[in-house]
């Protein structure tokens, strides 16, 4: 027995040998996106912020605070061995489910724009749906890592995805777009474990049916669909926001009007610092600036693919795939909405749009990815 233990410890040491690795490329891309986001946030919000808050730097100051707060979990998670979180996957899922339910409890949950999405504890407000995204990543990575071979069976896939139904339903009641993102994350992680096309086509059809059912049940969502299909005749605020956003994109031309020179941000594009910030980027920096930003996101996704492909174990690879899926889906949804390719959903642009909870948890997810990258060992040449 002692001999076996010595051999296993030697094998472990052998596996750990090699040059320690840390993906500074990923870190620099994230830092650049955050800095670029601060510049565009100030540009898009200075006018309305000066009128509403008597301080043109109001949103900029809050975003800097959010980024500083986000650095704490990012650095912490980057330094802690990611394998530690494997045993907390189910706990994270249950906590996120409870938090999402608390949104509907009077005096705890708070509403904005007709949706209950926040929990208020004194002066602090946060979105439990952001907690749910990272919780689902941890939960799915844990489950798939335990039964990787069983994912070849369709029934096993259905059972795992069925475990997420309570959380998806609770989130979808107040925030359908986040529910779609959670489903997308789960499906992408499952597809990596078992890339069988037929079973995922069946799941995709089920998701579409689920989304249509929720749209039909909620009147304001069906109104958004109608406004999306006929924006020129509908008279809702969402249509006005979309139309003004399209004007901003169209007026930017190839190279834009110049940084800070947007006209649509002067009260014409509502929430220009949030989910519509991409329209201001297009107006001020033009098609060239928009393409550069999209390429930067593609570079970010590519770095994550490299880390996932070289992770030391399946669990680490799944964590990175989950974060990568989250960011990719959110970028696609945001750009699709502002170009009127999809109905208005309120999905923000990662690292660029103004947001408290979203920025903090996005940076926490980046910390997880960096932790996985630290586990990679380069071969000695």
Give short role names for the model-derived ranges.
Residues 1-20, 41, 332-381:
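A juxtamembrane structural motif centered on a specific transmembrane helix
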Residues 1-42, 193, 205-212:
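Gram-positive cell-envelope targeting signals
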Residues 13-16, 47-57:
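Short helix-coil transition/hinge motifs at the ends and kinks of transmembrane helices
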Residues 18-20, 48, 152, 156-157, ...:
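Helix-boundary and loop/linker segments of multi-pass membrane transporters
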Residues 31-35, 43, 52-241, 279-340, ...:
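Hydrophobic alpha-helical transmembrane segments of multi-pass inner membrane proteins, especially
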Residues 175-181, 257-262, 272-274, 291, ...:
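Transmembrane helix boundary and interhelical junction motifs in multipass membrane proteins
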Residues 231-274, 278, 285-289:
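TM-adjacent membrane-interface loops and short helices in multi-pass inner/ER membrane proteins
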